[in-house]
Amino acid sequence: MIKRVFQLAALGLFASAAHAAAPIDNSALDKAEFREHKATYGVVYRLPQDVNAILDAKVNGTLKADLLKLGLKTEAETPNMPHVTVVHIHSADPETPARMLKALPKPPAPLQVTLKNFYPTEAAKGAGHPWWLDLGVVKSGQGFEDMMRYNTVATAALAPLRDGPLPRVTGPVYAKMAEAGRDLVKTMGVSGVNVMQDGKEVRAHNPHTTLVYSMAMYDARLQDAMKQEADKFNAVLPEGINTTFKDVSIVEIGFAGNVVREIYRVSLEDGSAIDVASGKKVGS
């Protein structure tokens, strides 16, 4: 019964969001180059200040210095609001964030999670770029399960608002993707999200926070360097970082996934929402 209600809710959200969206154009998937990036928006959990303080004290300074030594100046200076992503969509329509807020499913209660395990990863192995250095979320506990369930309903509700696939999963990345990833890009505009298939939840979401965003070619030198960085920081934070996410934000995102602007913030405690620029409450 619960599964049936969950499925119907996702389908209803999908239909209501799709009604407000522009047509979805997948023609970029037939091209060898990346799709031109107009604007990407997303739903993310901000990292709490206590987590940022630990990362600033134990990771970020050393990491920035190491990036500069490697010649990765752009990566060392990339602006970002530290976060864990729920879902990203591409849309050139500036009204998209407001539509996302309207379509956003009820968020979960505050999420108790553990951030643990630094690792480098590529958008698609062998594509060359983009690539990232991430810090994962421990895949157990109520907080993780709630995150996964919310990814499923949020993806169903918001993916119809896209105008096509995320540029970073097109071109050389799409060409190197496995079939399961390609199917998600075709149907949801992005890989790495959860969907309902035949009444069952199919999970591909891997929640994490990203410390390095790069479009440099991921050659053997950088692969080795990023493995060393991950090993170094795993030794510094072997137990990870326990924290609680208390809000979820609608944000604007750069090509590689970094947050460049927070637009709306929704409390996980009472569901209230604010316009970040004005500080005023929005919605009911």
Residue ranges and their predicted role:
Residues 1, 19-22:
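N-terminal targeting/docking segments
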Residues 1-7:
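Bacterial N-terminal signal peptides that target proteins for export
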Residues 8-17:
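Bacterial N-terminal signal peptides
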Residues 21-128, 137-246, 252-284:
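Basic, often amphipathic N-terminal segments
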